[in-house]
């Protein structure tokens, strides 16, 4: 039988509150139809309110083949959380090519989140002429700190 004391209860409460308050955004992976996407946020995988966050998403087809921005009619939308499917996005940042040490010409954007809180980034895309992947929608939860 478990015996709970005030000290144990406060310890659990502290642990749970720390876990809930800690942003967990680093390299979030999602899949939609035959497209996978891995979100990356700079600086240091944490967005800060009022500061520019450099966001990019590595898109791959099933099997691992990279989908560059040049092959995708991609759109990025930022929603505050919670939101409804019919809500207008808070932001619709324009996408540009991002190249890193490992990836070339992937979709990226610079985003300034207006305040601390929970947001959802939604990347949708359809193939441009000559590309062969199914239309997709990838949604990523993002916690913005101060």
Task: Describe these PLM feature segments.
Residues 1, 19, 88:
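Extended interaction regions within the primary functional domain
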Residues 2-12:
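Bacterial N-terminal signal peptides that target proteins for export
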Residues 11-21:
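Bacterial N-terminal signal peptides
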Residues 23-146:
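N-terminal soluble domains immediately following signal/targeting peptides that reside
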